[in-house]
Every structure is written in C-alpha cells, then in structure tokens.
Amino acid sequence: MSRALAPRIVVVRRPTEYELLIQQHGTRSQAAFYLERQGQKIDEIEERHRRIERALDAVRREIPLAWRNVGLLRSELDRFVFEEKDIIVAVGQDGLVANVAKYLQGQSVIGVNPDPTTYEGVLVPHEPAAVADLLADCAAGRASTESRTMVEVVLDDGQRLLALNEIFFGHRSHQSARYRIAVASGEERQSSSGVIVSTGTGATGWARSINQERNGILPLPTPEEPTIAFFVREAFPGSGFGTKTTYGLLRTQEELRIISEMSVGGVIFGDGIEEDSVEFLWGSTATVLASKTRLELVRAAQGSRR
C-alpha cells in the first residue's frame, strides 16, 4: 500500500532591488558607487533586502520538516509544473500574487507581506509567523479563501492569456489602436488609445481611475463577483469610427470580441507586464470573458489561533 505524498509548498518570490543591483554591477561597492553618483545611497535598499530575507527565512521555518517544499523566482513561473494540491506561498508585494495567479488552476495561495512599511498588503495580508497555521488549515481543507475572479482572453489561433487585475488591448507605442469591438448589442469600428478590461481586483487601480474620470459611470464589480468591466480609452470620433461602445459590464458567460486592424504594433498584455505581451495584428480576433479559473486567496480560518 503506497503512502500518500506529503503536501508540497511552493514559496515564490521576486529578486530584491539589492539583488538586481548586485547582478547589474557585480559587487556591493560598485553598486554603492553607482548610486552615489545618482545622489542616492545603498543603505536603505540593503535594509529592505534584509527585511525580505528575514521574512523568507521565517516562512521557511514555518514549513513542517516532513513536507516537501520548493523555492521559485517569479521569472521561473512559466517553466514550473504546479501540482494539483500544491500550496503556494507568495512572499512579496501585491503584484507578485497577480504574477503567480495566471499559472494556477485553483491551488490555494497564501500571500505574505515581508515589509509592511513598503507594501500595502491587500493581496499579501499575512505576516510570516502566521504561515504554519495557514498551511495546516490548507492541508486540512479548513482554510477560508476568497475566490477572486480573473479575466481571460482567447485568440483565434488558440493562444490564451489570464490576468488577475486587467488586460490591455492597444498599440505598443503611443499610436492609436484600430480595431472592431463587438458586444451583444452590436459591433463598432474604433480608433482609440486602447481598451482596458478589468476584474473586481483590478477595479481599485486603472479601471477605478478611468471610471472616476467619467463620473462613476459604471458600478465596478467586487473581487469575487463573476463580472468584468471594460473601458475604451479616448475613442476618436473620426470618419468611419464610432464612439458608442466605450464602456460596459460583462457578466457570467457574456463575451467581448475585439478584432484587430493593426498591421504592426498591436499587443495584448495582462496586469501591466508588457514583456509577456501577445501580438495582436490585423485580422486577429480576441474573445474576452470572466474566466472559469479563479484565484483562491487564503484568509484566516474561523477558530484558528491567528
């Protein structure tokens, strides 16, 4: 009779500013010299690095010795094969959780804030000392989670893009984006600064700013609501272009279609990560909807010791 595998914990982090400086300049003294020439000091950057390192060490100590664990950098996410029952511990800023979310299929994510003086902690609300209890809750199936909606884009060539906050359609440069946009009420040809499609998680950022500029024209969704919002930025009312379909809500199973009319420079990217962009050139069709894949973000379980 085979024994069940111990739970596997995947600890995800991104390089610190200090690590990137050392990588770029080779040594601490060379990095310090470079910063001093820019009128800056390395001390504060180094102290932030130490705080994050202390948090990572504390998290590792919270993992039971008999459990499996893997350390992962953000840059390695696209090459890593997650297991169905992995428990992910994201140690870093809120954006790290968004980076991780698009590679998951319902695994639990524990967000740990290594530096509350620097990071807001909306998606990383836990301190390192809470991790042992949270891991036990997850392994026992009693953890309380927020099931956050994600936005999904499927291209007609089969490519798929997921994002936790928002997805941008537009031109790589500052040129206008040209495309046709289609919703249930009809289709319209547009020239604009691009289209933003946001979840409830992303509704506190870019979408909120656009919505405020338009006097709160849409009731933005909450993070767990299976609804996404779209906004067209600066639609141009020129000959052959329309400006009627510039905002809206897409509820469960409702779709938005965008057909590119850009010969060069058309792109789609999620959560502000332009290096992960997908080309969106003339004739390509993108279908956007609230994804069936959701982020399972762990909160404290009722009756726990936290």
Question: Residue ranges of each PLM-predicted region?
Answer:
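Structural motif
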Residues: 86-87
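A solvent-exposed, charged loop/short amphipathic helix patch at secondary-structure junctions
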Residues: 24-46
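Catalytic phosphate-donor-binding core of small-molecule kinases
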Residues: 2-7, 15, 20, 34, ...
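A short, basic/flexible loop-to-alpha-helix module at the beginning of a structural domain
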Residues: 74-82
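Short, acidic/small-residue loops that bind anionic groups at enzyme active sites
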Residues: 103-123
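N-terminal glycine-rich "phosphate-gripper" loop used for MgATP/nucleotide binding
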Residues: 90-94
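Short glycine/serine/threonine-rich phosphate/pyrophosphate-binding segments
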Residues: 96-101, 203-208
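Short hydrophobic segments within beta-strands
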Residues: 12-14, 198
